[in-house]
Every structure is written in C-alpha cells, then in structure tokens.
Amino acid sequence: MPIIHVLIAKNTGAVLCEYTDYQGNFLTIARMILKNIKQNTRHTVQYESYQCHYINQDNLTYLCITSNFPEDTTFAFLMEVQKQFLAQNNYDDIMKEQSYFFQNFKNNLKNILDYYNKCPEKTLNGEIIKNLVDAKSIAIENVEKLIDRDQKLNITVQKSDKLYDQSKNINSLANSIKNQKKA
C-alpha cells in the first residue's frame, strides 16, 4: 500500500497544508496524533491498520499516513516534503499564518507523494547511494587533507632536526673559539 495522506502542521495543531487521494478519516487520525507529538522528534505511531510517521522540527510537523510502506522510504519522503516546503516559504511567514494558508503547496505534496508511491525502493536506494557517494567523497577529501598535513609535519620535523643539529654545531664552535681565546 502507498503513502495515503500527508500534512504539514504547526505545533499549535494548525494544519497548514494537506493532500490525499483517498477517502477516509485521515485528518481525524492525524489530528489525534498531532496532539501527542513532542518537539524535535521523529517517530512512527501505529493506529489500527495504519502507520503514522512524522518529523517534528522547529515547531513544524510533517506527517504522513501509510499502510505497509517501507519506513525508511517514508522518512525520506517526509524529509523531501520538509526540504521543499522550507525552500519555498519563509519560516517567519509560516509561523504567522493560519490554518490551510499554504494550500498552494498542495500540488507539490501531490508530486512528491506520487513520486515516492511509484518507486519507493528505487527512491530509497537512490537516496542511500547518493548519501554514500557524498560520504565517500568527504572521507576521501579528509584523508587527502590528513596526508597533506602529515607531509607538512614531516618536513617541519626534518627542518627542526636540521636546525637543532646546526645550533649544536654552532654552539660547539662557539665554545671552542671561546676556549681558544682563554688559552
């Protein structure tokens, strides 16, 4: 089964935008869940035969209702909803507006929902691969920086050893000249 219902709400319970293609009491279920959400959490709640997944961050909740849908894909879906919603809307404006003010975002919700419903595993695998490639490139970059630092440190140590040897030679030369003058 697919992602059935998606909504974006403020912590006050005001639903800013929602979308579903299905008939049912999904908004009622969502409102019951919204009442019990703690700030800055990510969780899945079972309600009868449905799973309600949500991300609450910065006083906004991104919630969807699914039936037998991969949890990882669901959270990838919610993060995409969050990313696009915040990219299109100013946070301060979001906090000022009333319920259903952002229904113009409904088409975006539909497009994201359709995309994730059509190929959930492929979408998740693509996200995982992208994240792994990004992590790999960052790790390679960090290793290259470490190697570069190590090389610079080795050069500095070699120069330091050379200067130390030179200072010992100069010191013993100075001592021998001093001893010759005394004699």
Residue ranges and their predicted role:
Residues 5-7:
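Generic short beta-strand
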Residues 2-3, 12-183:
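Acidic, low-complexity cytosolic segments
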